[in-house]
């Protein structure tokens, strides 16, 4: 036990030091970049002041002298602006990386508030998400989630809500997570790249337009001719006017004609533009994220498959998407002064719209494959980071036959290491139920959630908080905190009955379930509750089910005598020593001997 604790401590200290070193180094680097940016700003101000002074001093000189002075000061000013932009981008990246590692350090101390817990995903209708606190503040999802795309978040949440039941798929996912666990710099670069320009839930709908919108300009031969003809005529007009072969009035007339032609198809261009105008930045970000993936050589089958999905006839998906972002960016300038002028002289808007439609025709069908792969990788990065942050966790073995869940020293991932009491579990066949009895606050509910959360992690391919674990991936169903529903006019008791009926129906349909129940039939009197609980347990055993039931009703413990090969009793005791109540939170065999309600009432001065 001591050697195990020392191993965990040494592993966690290494992770703490890793993140702390990055925070220190990158905070210092960000400070240095801020100083450089401030210096560049000061130099630019000096250049402006110098230009004004020199123009004032040489104001009586020839215009060529003034033009030379302007060029002399403007060129370094522009160069400094470019340098400033690059330094500012580096500063933002550096600060974001330092901030990520600060948040990871907080996460190691169980403060996950910087990360999205997806509270909107929590649902009482779901088989287990509400009972196990999967979503929301200080939830399992919040502790794991490091996704930077809306699609990736949806993918990861989907894995939590629909864990795998296929052994081969779980092992394939384990292999991918193991590999990504070691790609720490890649995961961090991926996260920071995405978080600098975060998307939102509308991105997926916008991106779907890439393959759904029909072309309206690219098949029009007249416009394809005009985008070549108008610029050519302008070149001839310019040469003619320069050589005095044409009067300036001709240029004026052609300017008016070009203006009319340029905006003759404004409605069609608006149709193309409006479907894409908000996508420039998000596509630029997606291009950079995909580039992160393309630059690696993965060994695991799952990650190699994701990598291969970005291949596209000798080109990289990132460069193709970046080109689209550039086309959209160019069209986004159509209402600027330069954009209007270029449109009149070159039909730039029409040219860009045709390029966009051509891109969609050539690559529109590829986008679904690319962005699905990006979402997968985003979700895997979260699980890889989770594995990296918990070096003491293990990957469970996956059993072939229903049902088995056998583990040593299971702990809840959200309980602090210094207070987390770990317990074992042993279910080796079907049907089999563990009946857990015990006093209030003795640890029954925490144990149920510990088992449920680790079972879920194992079924999504992630490492689990245990010394060892073997499990069979069945569908998990829980009933731990059924509540009243005013909206549907449902009582607590009826809501619980519906839950239990759903479990029985699924079992009778042949579905393999892992069932976790806490204090069933709480909404009725003790005699009725006992009778109903006994009947339910017998029905669950008859349907070859497996699971765990926690209860205060000691009579349920008598079922072990009737079903010695299907039911096993365990207990959490409340020990009274020197007139004080203590809890060991250790699982023991047998039926609970001590209850604490009357003792606590007496301690609080309530007559019993």
Regions found by a protein language model. Give the residues of each.
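Short, Lys/Arg-enriched N-terminal segments with co-localized hydrophobic residues
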Residues: 1-11
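ATPase nucleotide-binding head domains, primarily ABC-like/P-loop NTPase cores
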Residues: 80-81, 262, 383, 389-608
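Alpha-helical coupling/stalk and coiled-coil linker elements that connect catalytic or binding modules
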Residues: 9-439, 446-476, 498-499
């Amino acid at each position: 036990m001591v050697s195990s604790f020392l191993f965990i401590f040494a592993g966690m200290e290494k992770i703490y030091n890793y993140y702390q070193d990055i925070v220190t180094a990158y905070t210092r680097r960000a400070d240095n970049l801020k100083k450089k940016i401030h210096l560049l700003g000061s130099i630019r101000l000096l250049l402006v002041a110098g230009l004004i002074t020199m123009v004032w001093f040489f104001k009586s000189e020839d215009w060529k002298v003034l033009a030379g002075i302007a060029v002399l000061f403007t060129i370094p000013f522009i160069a400094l602006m470019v340098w400033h932009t690059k330094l500012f981008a580096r500063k933002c990246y550096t600060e974001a990386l330092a901030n990520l590692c600060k948040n990871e350090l907080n996460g190691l101390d169980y403060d996950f508030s910087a990360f999205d817990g997806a509270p909107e995903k929590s649902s009482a209708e779901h088989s287990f998400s509400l009972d196990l606190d999967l979503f929301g503040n200080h939830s399992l999802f919040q502790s794991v989630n490091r996704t930077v795309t809306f699609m990736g978040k949806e993918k990861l949440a989907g894995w939590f809500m629909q864990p795998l039941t296929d052994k081969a798929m779980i092992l394939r996912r384990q292999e991918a997570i193991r590999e990504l666990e070691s790609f720490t710099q890649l995961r961090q670069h991926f996260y920071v790249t995405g978080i600098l320009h975060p998307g939102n839930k509308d991105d997926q709908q916008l991106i779907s337009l890439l393959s759904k919108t029909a072309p309206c300009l690219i098949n029009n031969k007249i416009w394809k001719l005009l985008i070549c003809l108008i610029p050519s005529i302008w070149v001839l007009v310019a040469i003619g006017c320069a050589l005095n072969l044409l009067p300036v009035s001709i240029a004026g007339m052609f300017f008016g004609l070009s203006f009319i032609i340029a905006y003759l198809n404004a409605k069609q261009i608006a149709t193309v533009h409006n479907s894409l105008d908000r996508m420039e930045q998000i596509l630029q970000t997606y291009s950079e994220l995909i580039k992160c993936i393309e630059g690696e050589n993965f060994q695991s089958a799952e990650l190699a498959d994701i990598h291969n999905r970005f291949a596209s006839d000798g080109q990289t998906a990132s460069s193709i998407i970046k080109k689209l972002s550039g086309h959209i960016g160019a069209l986004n300038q159509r209402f600027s002064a330069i954009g209007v002028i270029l449109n009149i002289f070159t039909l730039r808007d029409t040219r860009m719209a045709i390029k966009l439609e051509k891109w969609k025709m050539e690559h529109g069908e590829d986008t679904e494959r690319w962005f699905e792969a990006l979402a997968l990788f985003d979700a895997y990065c979260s699980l890889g980071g989770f594995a990296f942050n918990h070096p003491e966790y293990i990957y469970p073995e996956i059993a072939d036959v229903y049902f088995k869940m056998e583990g040593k020293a299971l702990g809840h991932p959200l309980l602090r290491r210094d207070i987390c009491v770990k317990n074992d579990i042993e279910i080796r066949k079907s049907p089999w139920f563990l009946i857990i009895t015990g006093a209030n606050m003795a640890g029954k509910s925490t144990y149920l959630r510990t088992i449920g959360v680790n079972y879920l992690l194992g079924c999504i391919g992630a490492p689990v908080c245990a010394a060892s674990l073997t499990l069979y991936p069945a569908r998990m169903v829980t009933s731990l905190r059924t509540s009243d529903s005013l909206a549907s006019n449902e009582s607590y008791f009826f809501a619980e009955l519906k839950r239990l009926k759903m479990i029985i129906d699924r079992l009778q349909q042949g579905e393999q379930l892992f069932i976790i129940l806490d204090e069933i039939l709480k909404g009725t009197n003790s005699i009725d509750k006992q009778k109903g609980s006994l009947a339910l347990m017998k029905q669950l055993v008859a349907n070859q089910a497996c699971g765990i039931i926690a209860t205060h009703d000691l009579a349920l413990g008598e079922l072990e005598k009737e079903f010695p090969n299907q039911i096993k009793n365990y207990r959490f005791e409340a020990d009274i020593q020197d007139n004080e109540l203590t809890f060991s939170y250790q699982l023991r065999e047998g039926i609970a001997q001590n209850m604490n309600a009357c003792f606590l009432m007496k301690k609080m001065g309530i007559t019993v």
